[in-house]
């Protein structure tokens, strides 16, 4: 019934016109009626085409109120979104400022800590130097005065110091202690006088005997080229002269003025003893002393070799630890790159869970920072051990190979090879630049750049194409090792591309007899046809 009544009213146009919104509201609850209206509206009468369309009615108060409410609500949403974005920006700025302050404070604390360690090291060295000078002064004074207890006390302090330094009592430890003891009893004052010379000048026979037993040389020259025997004879100390002659003092040695101990003897008895002394005994004792010195030199050399061997083993162990740290750091870098790629993928595909990926990136960055510190510490420890090894074997030290140049000169040195240094050397250049400017320079040159910390760059196919492109177009192939020693990883990836490729690339065997053609694949395309490789480009 309702559909029949509603139809004519809608078609005749005599009833009150409805707004589109009100019409929808009127027909929303009656689907059959709405469909009937649509059918009848789609088949109007012939007379309706000639009639003028009726103008829409003005919006009602309800419509106006709805529009006002919608505008106000949208303004509220916009203000709230603006406030949220402003708050996020302010939080971001505050966080960046906080991080900058923390980084600055961390840098200041790091510099302060380094300065404190350096200051403590310098203070310890200065304190050790003062203590050494004090022991030397005490030993010289005790020798002149004949204070045997003080001499033994000084030597005991030296033994205790070596014990604190970790010197043991094994064969090497005993050799080091003997060297230190001999060096102590043969110390010199500002004039070059030794404790034995001071004891001779003071006429202290017992001190002379004790110092000789400890390994002191009786024929050293001090101020004005005077020997201990010269000073004892000049002072008229007969017993001291006799004791010095017994331990091997040579009465034939001259001072700087050309005088001998016999000539400056202040007592006739002293001159008589020196004149009547059998020089054959002196010759025999000199031979014995020379043999003893040779034995000590051999022991010192043996100890030096053992010490160098020990340090070499230590360096090898530290090198293994450093390589382990570098490998862990490389894995951490790869993990960080994977996390970044996962985050970018989530953002591109609107997959959500970006908070989780960001947290994973933060965790990976923290892991990288920790491993960087460990790797840096291992590198510093290894460098100090290598320095100690070089100090132990200075004769094996060679001049540093290579050529030092500024970054502004890299284009002439690497790209143009001015002077044909690289061509004459026959090896591929290795650029070492702690500042990283050389890597930036090479990255923006016309090179095939491979970042060894990027797993995508280390894919075998990418390395193969980079190498082929370098040979085909005469472009440099650059492996950027960054701050990590990844050369073994590069070699491993080259071996994955082709067995023996790393060695063939290093010794230039890849260029001989067109060996590079083995890298070609059927899918490479016509630009990599064997005829496209030119000899002039291969030589570069």
From Swiss-Prot:
UniProt keyword terms in alphabetical order: ANK repeat, Coiled coil, Repeat
InterPro entries noted in UniProt: Ankyrin_rpt, Ankyrin_rpt-contain_sf, IQ_motif_EF-hand-BS, P-loop_NTPase
ANK repeat start-end pairs: 191-220, 224-253
Biased composition (Low complexity): 1-17
Region spans: Disordered: 1-62
Domain IQ, residue spans: 62-91
Taxonomic superkingdom: Eukaryota
Entry coiled-coil feature ranges: 281-388
PANTHER family cross-referenced by the UniProt entry: ANKYRIN REPEAT DOMAIN-CONTAINING PROTEIN 39, ANKYRIN REPEAT DOMAIN-CONTAINING PROTEIN 39-RELATED
UniProt name for this protein: IQ motif and ankyrin repeat domain-containing protein 1
Source species of the chain: Mus musculus (Mouse)
């Amino acid at each position: 019934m309702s559909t029949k009544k509603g139809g004519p009213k809608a078609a005749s146009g005599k009833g009150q016109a409805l707004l589109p919104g009100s019409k929808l509201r009127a027909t929303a609850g009656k689907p059959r009626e709405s469909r009937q209206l649509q059918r009848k509206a789609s088949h109007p009468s012939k007379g309706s085409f000639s009639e003028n369309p009726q103008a829409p009615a003005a919006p009602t108060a309800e419509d106006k109120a709805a529009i006002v409410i919608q505008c106000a609500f949208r303004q509220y949403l916009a203000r709230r979104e603006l406030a949220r974005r402003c708050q996020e920006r302010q939080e971001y700025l505050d966080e960046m400022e906080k991080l900058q302050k923390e980084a600055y404070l961390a840098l200041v604390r790091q510099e302060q800590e380094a300065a404190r360690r350096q200051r403590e090291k310098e203070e310890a060295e200065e304190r050790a130097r003062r203590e050494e000078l004090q022991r030397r002064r005490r030993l010289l004074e005790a020798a002149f005065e004949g204070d045997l207890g003080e001499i033994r006390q000084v030597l005991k302090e030296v033994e205790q110091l070596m014990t604190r330094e970790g010197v043991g009592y094994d064969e090497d430890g005993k050799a080091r202690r003997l060297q230190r003891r001999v060096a102590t009893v043969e110390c010199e004052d500002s004039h070059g006088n030794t404790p034995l010379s001071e004891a001779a000048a003071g006429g202290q026979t017992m001190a002379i005997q004790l110092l000789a037993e400890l390994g002191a040389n009786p024929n050293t020259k001090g101020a004005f080229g005077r020997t201990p025997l010269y000073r004892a004879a000049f002072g008229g100390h007969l017993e001291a002269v006799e004791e010095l002659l017994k331990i091997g003092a040579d009465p034939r040695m001259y001072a700087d003025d050309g005088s001998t101990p016999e000539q400056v003897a202040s007592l006739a008895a002293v001159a008589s003893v020196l004149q009547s002394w059998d020089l054959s005994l002196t010759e025999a004792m000199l031979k014995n002393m020379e043999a003893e010195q040779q034995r000590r030199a051999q022991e010192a050399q043996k100890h030096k070799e053992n010490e160098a061997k020990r340090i070499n083993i230590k360096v090898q162990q530290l090198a293994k630890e450093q390589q382990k740290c570098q490998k862990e750091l490389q894995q951490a870098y790869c993990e960080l790159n994977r996390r970044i790629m996962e985050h970018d993928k989530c953002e591109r595909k609107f997959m959500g869970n970006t908070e989780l990926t960001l947290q994973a990136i933060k965790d990976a960055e923290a892991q990288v920072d920790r491993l960087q510190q460990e790797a840096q510490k291992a590198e510093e420890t290894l460098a100090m051990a290598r320095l100690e090894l070089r100090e132990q074997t200075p004769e094996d030290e060679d001049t540093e190979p290579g050529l030092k140049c500024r970054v502004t000169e890299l284009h002439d040195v690497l790209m143009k090879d001015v002077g044909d240094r690289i061509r004459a050397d026959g090896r591929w250049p290795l650029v070492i630049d702690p500042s990283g400017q050389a890597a930036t320079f090479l990255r923006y040159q016309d090179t095939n750049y491979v970042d060894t910390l990027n797993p995508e760059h280390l894919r075998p196919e990418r390395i193969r194409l980079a190498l082929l492109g370098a040979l085909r177009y005469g472009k440099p192939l650059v492996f950027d090792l960054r701050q990590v020693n990844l050369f073994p990883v590069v070699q491993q990836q080259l071996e994955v591309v082709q067995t023996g490729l790393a060695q063939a690339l290093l010794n230039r065997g890849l260029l001989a007899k067109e060996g590079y053609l083995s890298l070609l694949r059927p899918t490479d395309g016509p630009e990599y046809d064997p005829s496209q490789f030119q000899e002039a480009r291969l030589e570069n």
